[in-house]
Design a protein with these regions (language model features):
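RNA-contacting regions in translation and RNA-metabolism proteins
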Residues: 1-45, 49, 55-77
Length: 77
């Protein structure tokens, strides 16, 4: 899952070497939290107009997680 998120984000940004993902352990609600970090200049590319790109990334990640019976949340920082 982490590799998928890095691959998606790296394809969107100008500085793919600065894309990192931190993963939190499962919280009390059974949710795994992924923290996506990109360069400040690339933040707009990852979020997109009105958050459309961010929503699409979260949708793909949730669909993949559902196939594995997991609950996830993606935070972009």
């Amino acid at each position: 899952m982490k590799e998928l998120l890095v691959t998606i984000a790296a394809g969107l940004v100008d500085e793919p070497e600065k894309v990192t993902v931190d993963v939190d352990d499962i919280n009390d609600e059974g949710v795994i939290v992924y923290h996506l970090h990109v360069a400040a200049d690339d933040m707009g590319r990852v979020i997109g107009k009105q958050g459309r790109i961010a929503k699409a990334i979260r949708t793909v990640m949730r669909a993949t997680a559902n196939r594995n019976d997991q609950k996830i949340m993606v935070e972009i920082a």
